[in-house]
Amino acid sequence: MERINSTLLTAFILTGIPYPLRLRTLFFVFFFLIYILTQLGNLLILITVWADPRLHARPMYIFLGVLSVIDMSISSIIVPRLMMNFTLGVKPIPFGGCVAQLYFYHFLGSTQCFLYTLMAYDRYLAICQPLRYPVLMTAKLSALLVAGAWMAGSIHGALQAILTFRLPYCGPNQVDYFFCDIPAVLRLACADTTVNELVTFVDIGVVVASCFSLILLSYIQIIQAILRIHTADGRRRAFSTCGAHVTVVTVYYVPCAFIYLRPETNSPLDGAAALVPTAITPFLNPLIYTLRNQEVKLALKRMLRSPRTPSEV
């Protein structure tokens, strides 16, 4: 599985995650179910937002629909390849496939960071400036903000992919990870990676730290505003719409910070931590938003219990 130093690699072998061989089938079935339920859950969110006129024109739920698209996409570029680790035989990933996987993961992941920030800002405007909210956050503005998040995410993903794969890869081709990510791939480079590691740390650090700081600042203002609400029902509804977002942000940011914002150690915990944003978070997001968001729950009930009659269409 090693190439001589004068030969550039044309494929990589992803070693996957370590597991007992006797549990091969169990792990395959587990991640297969995770993948299917992720797609179905996020598709249900998309259909609910699109079908309910009370939701699909509101910026908060436009953002939620985009989040579902991102979750479905991240799961699709990571989990099927991970499942191949639990089948017999070695299945290399082509060099171009590795480039594409790294690009799309960082493109979608950074877009998700920006989107979480937009969702926090939207909640800040809705709760702290409710009278001006319809003017400050219009459907047109939310669409422009989403387009900006996609564009910034694409630039971030392209930067990371170009910096990583401009280096020569001519030695071992085993990526000690379950997908092509920057730290694992850089270990195979036949050149000094100091600049790459520094740029990666700064770039991802700026994205994560700036987005998280803006989210934190928004929620400090939101909590102060909620505590000033006089009615218990008003406070409950405000916490209901914000609680789901706080939960998914926490679940997403903690493992990302653990993986990228610490010195390179090649810890066996990296793989376990990376499973959270790549497989677990996309699976949990629909559950969190349907269980903790009262408006989504009510929209689901309306859609499931009250199908439209021909006269209503």
UniProtKB/Swiss-Prot annotation:
Biological process (GO), any one: detection of chemical stimulus involved in sensory perception of smell
GO cellular component, one term: plasma membrane
Subcellular location(s) per record: Cell membrane
Residue pairs linked by disulfide bridges in the UniProt entry: C98-C190
InterPro entries in the record: GPCR_Rhodpsn, GPCR_Rhodpsn_7TM, Olfact_rcpt
Residue ranges annotated as Extracellular topological domain: 1-25, 77-100, 162-198, 260-270
GO MF entries: G protein-coupled receptor activity; olfactory receptor activity
Glycosylation site positions: N5, N85
Pfam families associated with the record: 7tm_4
Residues annotated as transmembrane: 26-46, 55-76, 101-121, 141-161, 199-218, 239-259, 271-291
Protein purpose: Odorant receptor.
Protein name: Olfactory receptor 10G3
Gene field: OR10G3
